[in-house]
Amino acid sequence: MDISSFLLPQLLRKYQQDVYNIASKQNTLLVMRTGAGKTLLAVKLIKQKLEEQILIQESNLEHKKISVFLVNKVPLVFQQAEYIRSQLPAKVGMFYGELSIEMSEQLLTNIILKYNVIVITADLFYLFLARGFLSINDLNLIIFDECHHAIGNDAYARIMNDFYHRAKAVLSKKHFTLPRIFGMTASPFTGKKGNLYHRLYQWEQLFDSKAHVVSENELADYFCLPEESYVMYSNKLVVPPSDSIIKKCEETLQGCKLISRAVKTALAETIDMGLWFGEQVWLYLVDFVETKRLKKKALGKQLSDDEELAIDRLKIFVEDWKNNKYSDNGPRIPVFDSTDVTDKVFKLLELLKATYRKSDSVRTVIFVERKATAFTLSLFMKTLNLPNIRAHSFIGHGPSDQGEFSMTFRRQKDTLHKFKTGKYNVLIATAVAEEGIDVPSCNLVIRFNICRTVTQYVQSRGRARAMASKFLIFLNTEELLIHERILHEEKNLKFALSELSNSNIFDSLVCEERERVTDDIVYEVGETGALLTGLYAVSLLYNFCNTLSRDVYTRYYPTFTAQPCLSGWYCFEVELPKACKVPAAQGSPAKSIRKAKQNAAFIMCLDLIRMGLIDKHLKPLDFRRKIADLETLEEDELKDEGYIETYERYVPKSWMKVPEDITRCFVSLLYTDANEGDNHIFHPLVFVQAHSFPKIDSFILNSTVGPRVKIVLETIEDSFKIDSHLLELLKKSTRYLLQFGLSTSLEQQIPTPYWLAPLNLSCTDYRFLENLIDVDTIQNFFKLPEPVQNVTDLQSDTVLLVNPQSIYEQYAFEGFVNSEFMIPAKKKDKAPSALCKKLPLRLNYSLWGNRAKSIPKSQQVRSFYINDLYILPVSRHLKNSALLIPSILYHIENLLVASSFIEHFRLDCKIDTACQALTSAESQLNFDYDRLEFYGDCFLKLGASITVFLKFPDTQEYQLHFNRKKIISNCNLYKVAIDCELPKYALSTPLEIRHWCPYGFQKSTSDKCRYAVLQKLSVKRIADMVEASIGACLLDSGLDSALKICKSLSVGLLDISNWDEWNNYFDLNTYADSLRNVQFPYSSYIEETIGYSFKNKKLLHLAFIHPSMMSQQGIYENYQQLEFLGDAVLDYIIVQYLYKKYPNATSGELTDYKSFYVCNKSLSYIGFVLNLHKYIQHESAAMCDAIFEYQELIEAFRETASENPWFWFEIDSPKFISDTLEAMICAIFLDSGFSLQSLQFVLPLFLNSLGDATHTKAKGDIEHKVYQLLKDQGCEDFGTKCVIEEVKSSHKTLLNTELHLTKYYGFSFFRHGNIVAYGKSRKVANAKYIMKQRLLKLLEDKSNLLLYSCNCKFSKKKPSDEQIKGDGKVKSLT
């Protein structure tokens, strides 16, 4: 393949061709001014490697390699990738940002296969190499854009040192070629000439390259420097007045972390630009924090108190100020005085007015230092609506150090495009546009803020590329000195580069060996090539600590402790949090503290790799992520419940095995109990089987006509003798009754081991089969229909035919048309007329739910002359029974499948319960596995929790969750079901009466009407069968039976069949042995409260140790593992109660009821009732505040319990209280030898404290209801506000008096300047809840304080804070 024709026709200039000839043959560092075509040369080199790769692949000489274009800014990824795509037919990949955190091995493996070139940020590429997803051997070219950044620990330097030079050292051993290196820069260094020589030499060593400098003389014929001049402005700075919005906010909100940076930003803008600019910052930040709040709430995240405070206070300040100074049309017009607008801004404005007075074709870039400056300058020009000026800001995407101004990558790209096309002609940019970004050629470049380095100066000046362009620098007298220093350094740089151009001065330099800034200690993972260094090890340890189980009150991080060492040397020991249970590691000595810490971190990472806690790609084993991956996999496999697979149905052995010479048989009598009128009298049937029949209870049938029918099977224990004559008679009877009930002809394909016959109602001797069978009726089956001779022939149970050839069009006699025709007729024209109702061809008695609600077709009633009618020698009662037969056989078959299922897996459950467990909703019966699946799921969670708790006793909580998830996940249950061939027992096929056919028969009318041997099942349905089967055994036979089926199915629990066998895997006496020397003084109080005495007191102590206590000496464990198991135990106790309490509740309803009892708020309240919060061992001041806050709210709202019995359900509760309760329940469970009986106190405690879950009513959001109600009344002057009250308190000690400042949040609802409802608390959420409860009380009482009529439809102005009057407890912020 020749790709040369694809390259856009860009002829290289002479200097470019010279560079290309060199760079195509050797590693090269190119130093050339901005805009001279460095990127074009890089693309030419990529094209060369692409052509070589094509030839190599065609010859099958080497595996595929790719080219890498490295950049140091994300916008450059988009820019360079787009340019390469426009020039080459290569497949170009873009990689940037945080993709590395969750980068999968599969994705990165596909890079080589999918792309020819990748454009990637340097830091991310380093991680690709460090984690072994790519290697130097996979590359043929590495391009370093702006390579002058390769200093110190920069990613460029680390890539070369850690991977390129390491690969070069073993090049001869591994037999591979190194990639070509091409570095590009316009500003290699700042400072003295000697320093430049030294730095270039170091770069040559680092990049294994030769530097090539293109001097300005070589470029003189192609480029000209812009005209450079200065604009001097006054040094006078603006001091914000004391009554300004910025000063007031600075004084009042100085403690709010959220806006501390905003204060700095606004003040900086005010001082440098003017008061108007500072005001715009505040307006922007108010919108920002409100957007941040809404986003957090949309994601279900809780706002911190500081964030809530900042939002509410800022809104109050700025809203009032905005109402006074702003119109509805936008920002106020700035005043051109020395306060509102500084001299610097004024001179910029005058300059732009002069430039754009006559034309808008000039392109201008204004470089500023701060993002906020770019934002406000752009807004300033738009507010003034200057003619011919279309300004827009261009800033970076990352968070600012001083404010939350940012621009997404897409907006950056869009802004540049609009600047290129002329929609914008003034671009106000930060440093993001100085270097590398392809800003179009500009006529005017303005440095609004001074350059701090030569690089900044050269790069920004390089943006002025148009002919006759200008470069203006704004300076005051102090900045002029700085600029002169920059010019001097730039002069040295130009002189040095001129000397270096086309010279070999490097060869004469004596320089130290290549600078190495990375570690000498490294570890390479042989399987992946991932490389661990000391520098990477430190961040890896912090990442590992972030994966540990913790709550908001606990933070984990590695601890470095200095160890004794020789003078001038340092040595450190690193210790991970005790929750890891990993021993400390000591590093080798080093001459710097930083290097010594890296050595210790390196040794610890090696230990973690050996333990399997860091994987082969140097990624910490994050069980939270592994759980999420499992859930994602499960969701991907199960998300489409419409995805189904076909499985063979199990056919009962009783249906298939037919003895060759049958002499004995078994009999069941089929009765019904629906006898509402003659229409629903059913003739009893004899059900004869070749095999003994399992005991089956009665079952209910239902259809769209008539009442429900209860089928009773009376099985006779003794077998009966049968001969060939009687057997032949039964076969004929069976076929006739089936045809009679289905109204179609049947052909028997294979013999069946069951037969049907009408019961002899006059039989008194049940010892012989021939006595039970109504032989006379069977013989009548085969008689021809006889015409009606007389009206006396017509009876209520007579089945009539109009056409003797159409035996399935049957009618029932209903009466005569006129009573005068009750005498015999001698002539046809005088024959009486009979009213006849057409009988159904077939009936489905397995209709439930929506199918049973369908309106049946009305039975047609017609009149016939009796002489035209024929009598079928079968009673209408038998016809009714025949219509039942398909549904009876359908149900019996399902029960036989369930019986075989029980027999195969040796289960201890009833047949009807097993049948329910195997029946899905698709069968459309009056029962399915829904409830049993819920029941079994709860037991499986308990069993899996105990299993992983016992198998992994020293692992963190996340790992327990992960290992449990592997057992209880639907993916695992699906695999279990497939391995056990469980799908064949599924009962998911509904009875479709039109197409149903009994086993062994086929309808003569259609080949499609055969016995169904296949069924379609979804993956989720199959997984649910496992849990439903467990639930069936648990329901009928208890815990041991449930364990046995788990063992039979091999779901992953420990190999036990008896509940007491859990104790074989648990040593009560040695558990929590690390606490043997730690005292817990509250044991007796807790035992007295719960009424249980512990054998192992350490278990009880462990249940009350919060993770924050693990910083204490002698504490090496916490309650997290106990809380994990206690959660499952408590779930099971509650579900046991709910399942039996509400037998008609669906699984969804049961889940809601369970959530009411076991949610965090309910459990925290129970823990509070038991006073558990008083005994929690912790080291967190925040936890003390949370406990105090929670206790205050509970005690306050207990007084209003009659109005809202479930008040605690609305309070934001501390999770550690609920965790402690679950841990304590687990401690009792373990201490009692896994006995659920020991927890009998739990259920009464929950029911008495929480009440009945079914009585709770969701009242909706009260605030929303009130808002809507007042809006409907036409009121416009209402709303909510949050204020803060700081209460000072003192505490006397022996030495002095300590002052404390406590913050309280006040949430108020106001109407027309008056506070209607008010809530006060230490937490914003709880203050709002209190306010809502008082608002609800007013609404329920229909209080005039809330609901009075008003006339404010024409008044839109809201009251100020001064107008809102409280009760003296709340002060307005203003």
From Swiss-Prot:
Which residue numbers delimit the RNase III domain? 916-1038, 1083-1233
Region spans: C-terminal dsRNA-binding fold:
1263-1355
What would changing residue 1349 to A do, according to UniProt?
A: Decreases location in the nucleus. Abolishes retention in the nucleus
User: What cofactor is this protein dependent on?
Assistant: Mg(2+); Mn(2+)
Source organism's superkingdom?
Answer: Eukaryota
Chain ranges passing through the membrane: none
Task: Tell me the ranges covered by the Dicer dsRNA-binding fold domain, including all copies.
Answer: 537-628
What EC designation does it have?
Answer: 3.1.26.-, 3.6.4.-
Residue window of motif DECH box: 145-148
Q: Which residues form the Helicase C-terminal domain?
A: 340-517
A GO CC annotation recorded here is: pericentric heterochromatin
* Role summary: Required for G1 arrest and mating in response to nitrogen starvation. Ago1 regulation of cytokinesis and cell cycle checkpoints occurs downstream of dcr1. Required, indirectly, for regulated hyperphosphorylation of cdc2.
What protein family is recorded?
Belongs to the helicase family. Dicer subfamily.
Q: Spell out the protein name for this chain.
A: Protein Dicer
In its UniProt entry, the species of origin is given as Schizosaccharomyces pombe (strain 972 / ATCC 24843)
Q: Which gene encodes it?
A: dcr1
